[in-house]
Design a protein with these regions (language model features):
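N-terminal FAD-binding dinucleotide-binding subdomain shared by FAD-dependent oxidases/monooxygenases
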Residues: 2-11, 16-21, 25-156, 171-172, ...
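Ligand/cofactor pocket segment of small-molecule handling proteins
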Residues: 193
Length: 533
């Protein structure tokens, strides 16, 4: 179906997570010749690599799943309210097998570079060998797929074993009888720490920045709830797409400070009792002003104090200096309770900074700690990391890395000026990581598929954003962020966890509803803001 016959494929997809698998199914269904390259030795994307104990999704299983095939969503039975990594991985394997996707996937094949040819209007993609040509190059490389290893003096000298949560060994790790240290208390660390504490002889947690976390209240999926969901899936999916977060939270349209204190606490209590992200929907201005945010942040701080028995440890676990939610809020199972165990020590690096890793453990400003195993729960080079590691060259020989040296710029998070027929799924400038990722992914994939169909039926070979449209969208993304408290935290949303990375707020805070409306308007106007040839 390709309009350009000078290439071997209509589309090459990079990445076999949720995005890549849905893209492959969708484009193949349109009669396109599509192939997918995946660096791992199985499908799953983020859920292939992140196998650490306790790894699980912070969106409920019935919502963190594909909606494109009703038989699939009816036949699959989730085990828990919040699915663990093995279950999500099994689900994605099932999707690949059920729809016979593997025949068009090359596993253990890392894309190293891609170059656009202006004369033939094709991309040549180099993946661990000879290049293949394609009309469209679609990056489904994920937002959290490149682990970040911190630059800590002496790290390479540690005599024990070191593991990163983002690249966990398939065979697992036995912590029984071991002295273990964990560096990092973001989402990965907060999930890992309670599991390690159950089996380790002793666990030392080296914490630089305390995190806000809410209880998941996870458990087996109630059969009656599952039946109700499956009987009403179309409406549930519709409500998710009609929600700013891509999942229904029961958002309250009141402002926090317009409500008396007692009523506000009652609202927070009700949502705390539901678990998960329900708390963030308590009032519509929680992420808009410091004053409103303080009401929910102080509520969570009080919950931490009430849970952790030792007052000094509790105060060290209290997040300070940034708004709740400005760094991704964590969803945990017994995280704060873990610090009541006798075999767990919290080291507050705000009081005594980490100076170095030693052969035997770690040295801070006032003490030394010995351990046998070191776990790095130090996050990812988010949103742009995977793209930075591929040498992508567009018009005039400009590389994507060079274009983005001052921060990522896109039009709608979908395309980049100067890089024709390069499409991004859940890219910077789209809601992506601020929403239910599967909802955001499905909207992007469907938009991209409709675009390719439009180009084929109208005889166009190439599409890329006009520079003016890209500049306008970047300005809009930045303006929207400035109306919120998000930029007030040194978060991975800002790229602040990567030394030397430009600090700009990368996702789009306007929400899924307004974003999808904008994307649809662009398409309805013949893809306004894009240049088609």
């Amino acid at each position: 179906m390709r309009t350009n016959t000078r290439c071997s494929h209509d589309a090459i997809i990079v990445g076999a997570g949720f995005s890549g698998l849905y893209l492959l199914w969708k484009l193949r269904g349109q009669g396109l010749n599509v192939h997918l390259f995946e660096a791992g030795d199985d499908v799953g994307g983020t859920w292939f690599w992140n196998r650490y104990p306790g790894a699980r999704c912070d969106v409920e299983s019935v919502d963190y799943s594909f909606s494109f095939d009703d038989e699939l969503q009816q036949e699959w039975k989730w085990k828990e309210r919040y699915p663990a990594q093995p279950e999500i991985f099994e689900y994605l394997q099932h999707v690949a097998d059920r729809f016979d996707l593997r025949r068009d996937i090359s596993l253990t094949t890392r894309v190293r570079s891609a170059r656009y040819d202006e004369d033939t209007r094709t991309w040549t993609v180099y993946a661990d060998g000879a290049g293949v040509t394609t009309q469209f190059l679609i990056m489904a490389t994920g937002c959290l797929s490149v682990p970040q290893t911190p630059n800590i003096p002496g790290l390479e000298c540690f005599a024990g074993r070191t593991y990163h949560t983002g690249d966990w060994p398939k065979e697992g790790v036995d912590f029984s009888g071991k002295r273990v240290a964990v560096i990092g208390t973001g989402s990965s660390g907060i999930q890992l720490i309670p599991e390690v504490a159950k089996v380790a002889e002793h666990l030392t947690v080296l914490q630089r920045t305390a995190s806000f976390s809410v209880p998941a209240l996870n458990g087996p999926l109630d059969p009656e709830f599952e039946r109700e969901v499956k009987a009403n899936y179309p409406e549930r999916r519709r409500r998710a797409r009609a929600s700013s977060a891509g999942v229904e939270r029961g958002d309250n349209e009141q402002n926090a400070l317009d409500v008396p204190y007692e009523d506000r606490v009652k609202e927070f209590d009700g949502r705390w009792g539901k678990g998960g992200f329900a708390l963030l929907g308590a009032y519509q201005d929680l992420m808009l002003t410091d004053e409103a945010n303080d009401t929910v942040a102080d509520y969570v701080r009080d919950k931490i104090r009430a849970t952790v028995e030792d007052p000094d440890t509790a105060e060290s676990l209290i997040p300070r200096g940034y708004p709740l939610g400005a760094k991704r809020i964590c969803v945990d199972t017994n995280y704060f309770e873990t610090y009541n165990r006798g075999n767990v020590t919290l080291v507050d690096l705000r009081k005594s900074p980490l100076e170095s890793i030693t052969p035997a453990g770690a040295r801070t400003g006032d003490a030394e700690y010995e351990f046998d195993v070191l776990c790095l729960a130090t996050g990812f080079d988010a949103m742009t990391g995977a793209l930075d590691r591929i040498d992508i060259t567009g018009v005039g020989g400009e590389t994507l890395k060079n274009k983005w040296q001052h921060g990522p710029t896109t039009y709608l998070g979908l395309g980049v000026a100067g890089f024709p027929n390069l499409l991004l799924i859940a890219g910077s400038g789209s809601p992506s990581v601020l929403a239910n990722m599967v909802t955001a992914i499905e909207q992007h994939v469907e938009w991209a598929a409709e675009l390719l169909g439009y180009m084929s039926s109208h005889g166009y070979d190439t599409i890329e954003p006009a520079q003016e449209a890209e500049d306008g969208w970047v300005a809009h993304v930045n303006e929207m962020a400035s109306y919120t408290v998000f930029p007030k935290a040194a978060s991975w949303y800002m790229g602040a966890n990567i030394p030397g990375k430009p600090q700009i707020f990368m996702p789009y805070v306007g929400g899924c509803v307004e974003y999808e409306k904008k994307c649809n308007e662009v398409a309805e106007k013949g893809y306004s803001g894009f240049v088609l040839r």
